[in-house]
Amino acid sequence: MKRIQRKRTKGWKMPINTKYVGRPTKWGNPFRVEDLGAEEAVKLYKECILNNAMCYSYMDVREARIQFERFKWMAENLEQLRGLDLACFCSLSSPCHADALIELLKINNKT
């Protein structure tokens, strides 16, 4: 299991056994890098999946309610990603929420 950088270049194809987890998908990170920086956005994303109630000071009440259900779903369905490579447009040298998903799967594997 590894992170793949998805590309928009002509002829690029996503490898077999790879799941795109970018922003428009149900696995996307709602915390924007432009607002928080990459490290903080990834950290909050991971914390929200681990402990759903901890991360809503950055959101208004309506958005927090929506994201609560979304992160709850992610925590309950994380195993769907096991054994897949995860693709996102983030540079491989930058922090990415796909790495957080991979880390969480490794943690779940140990318990």
Predicted regions and their residues:
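Catalytic phosphate/metal-binding cores of nucleic-acid and nucleotide-processing enzymes, i.e., regions
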Residues: 1-111
